[in-house]
């Protein structure tokens, strides 16, 4: 089966080359027909799991489409070449081609397709190169934002923010979360704004910037419904505990369901939050100590003894 598909692919390549040849009666290459044959060759090689040959066929198809000024189809072919590289576990090279495809989609006036390609590239590279994935998600968010598709934009910004937190790039994470919060405010999704304020505060406290954390809460009072919400009360309690270096109070807040059931990356920030100087523990109630022999009874004991024989 594989051998048959490989032969089929080679036949399509040969046909494509013929379409590109010029002669006495054919002055211009037939790029459209050549691109079609290269595409068929790529499919045949892919079915035979010959990904290197499939990738090469896709690249030739892309060039043929470019020569024919068919940018959208050229971009599709570059994207397919990228997916062949993904099958070969060559992820950075795959992302490079998918990025190229997305730029061509934009040039062609199809921003939605460009954004989807960039997001796909981000997912591919996320575990290998988180920094690159952040860049791709931010690019995707910008494309969606330019198209006024704010819900899609903020979703991608959220992915970027979580990756920044995971990589402990807190300065960048703080800016990214603020951008998310601004968009949620614009689309009037106020409850999510409250959650983003919690995320902001945790990030700022991990940056050891209490002033910025407090400012976030203060600025959020202008968001409808925030003042008086459980999010607001919890944050005020958290900041109070942090300011007073009360580790117990901080831990109690960060272990509450409100914090524990946030996105995993933010929940971890809460659980790992330590107040400056290591914090102080609340004093546990003093346990009554045994009285040494010969020590006089307390006033309460004496009072009890006084009436032990009754009132008469």
Curated annotation (Swiss-Prot):
Residues 300-312 have a biased composition (Acidic residues). It is a peripheral membrane protein. Keywords: ER-Golgi transport, Golgi apparatus, Membrane, Phosphoprotein, Protein transport, Transport. SUPFAM superfamilies: TPR-like (SSF48452). Residues 281-312 are annotated as: Disordered. The modification Phosphoserine is found at residues 284, 308. The modification Phosphothreonine is found at residue 287. Interacts with RAB11FIP5. Interacts with VTI1A. Required for vesicular transport between the endoplasmic reticulum and the Golgi apparatus. This is Gamma-soluble NSF attachment protein. The lineage of its organism: Eukaryota, Metazoa, Chordata, Craniata, Vertebrata. The gene is NAPG.
